[in-house]
Regions:
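Short, conserved phosphate-binding/catalytic loop or strand-edge motifs used
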Residues: 125-130
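Short, surface-exposed linear patches
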Residues: 49, 131-132
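Noncatalytic partner-interaction/assembly domains of nucleic-acid and motor enzyme complexes
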Residues: 1-116
Length: 132
């Protein structure tokens, strides 16, 4: 039985995600802040798979809730001291190239949420397997 459990766990090493959808949503918000409110009813920062995308979405949220514009220039201060493998200010400019229509960004938000739910189900399944 242990071998079967190992096989199941190996199949779940790559958790469900869609990085392209995450980039498109963030890029779209950075280009058109007006879509944030609708997207924020679907997803929050914890729904993103990529930890950097979680941080970026949180920073966008902070700026927009303060009534400020969220774009690569205004977000630069949030990430100047980040010690990540990527240059976040440059990444923010790059990710705006993935921006899409508001309608598509909303659909991509639903995909991000769906991937989050799937990851949570995988975690629950792994917990059940571990306690079995």
């Amino acid at each position: 039985m242990e071998n079967n459990l190992s096989i199941v766990k190996d199949n779940f090493k790559e958790l469900p995600n869609n990085i392209e959808a995450e980039q498109a949503v963030i890029g779209s918000i950075l280009v058109t802040n007006e879509i944030f409110d609708e997207i924020n009813t679907i997803i929050s920062n914890i729904n993103f798979y990529d930890p950097m995308h979680q941080k970026i979405f949180s920073a966008i949220e902070n700026l927009i809730y303060k009534g400020m514009l969220a774009n690569p220039i205004t977000l630069k201060n949030y990430f100047e001291n980040e010690k990540d493998e990527i240059n976040v200010p440059e990444y923010l400019v790059k990710v705006t190239k993935f921006s899409t229509s508001s309608r598509q960004a909303i659909e991509y938000s639903k995909i991000i949420y769906d991937m989050f739910v799937r990851r949570e189900l995988v975690k629950i399944s792994e917990n059940i397997i571990d306690t079995a």
